[in-house]
Amino acid sequence: MFKQQFIFHWCVVFLISALVIALPVRISHAESAEPDFLNVALGGYDVHDDWNAVEARLEYRSNMELSVFRPFTGFMTTNDRSMYGYGGVLVDVFFSPRIVLQPSLAVGAYAKGSGKDLGHWIQFRTQLELAWRFDDRSRAGLSLSHMSNAHLSSNNQGTEAVMLNYAVPFDRIAGKSIWE
């Protein structure tokens, strides 16, 4: 019971904090709704401990808005054959038309391969990404994420990743939004 309360508590704290931070900033940029994105990322996995693995990600970031939140889904893999499929919510916080901070929260299924044992197949990921927004709305950024099982198991080492991200508007790839 304590584990579920702990997870719920931190999810609520994250979402309320993101809402409080993003709502006033987002409203000032509401006239320019963002497109959906295909994000590719490459970087270091388990950077706090070993930094002995490379991580690659592919994400779809929807343009559907649920208040200030936008859903996303993705897949991550490492050269250790660890894999993680996930979905969650994110918030765009615009500090200017070019500078975007994007906190996100996701939950998904993890398979360790020959990589790090994170103690449970269910993993939660929190991430902060700081990106530069180009004229065509594509973004290049740096992200820092933490992934752990939030004490669903007594083995809860967690891991961190530092990633270089490039998000391209989906309509530039497919010629239209995925929802059209």
Regions found by a protein language model. Give the residues of each.
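Repeated loop/turn-to-beta-strand initiation elements of outer-membrane beta-barrel proteins
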Residues: 38, 65-70, 97-101, 136-142, ...
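Outer-membrane beta-barrel initiation region
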Residues: 28-63, 172-177
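Cleavable N-terminal export/targeting peptides
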Residues: 1-34, 171-180
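Solvent-exposed loop/turn segments connecting transmembrane beta-strands
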Residues: 44-54, 75-86, 113-121, 151-159
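Residue-level signature of outer-membrane beta-barrel architecture
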Residues: 60-64, 91-93, 132, 146, ...
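Hydrophobic, lipid-facing positions within transmembrane beta-strands of outer-membrane proteins
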Residues: 38, 52-58, 69-71, 83-89, ...
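Transmembrane beta-barrel strands of outer-membrane/channel proteins
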Residues: 40-44, 73-77, 103-109, 142-146
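Outer-membrane beta-barrel "beta-signal"
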Residues: 54, 157-180
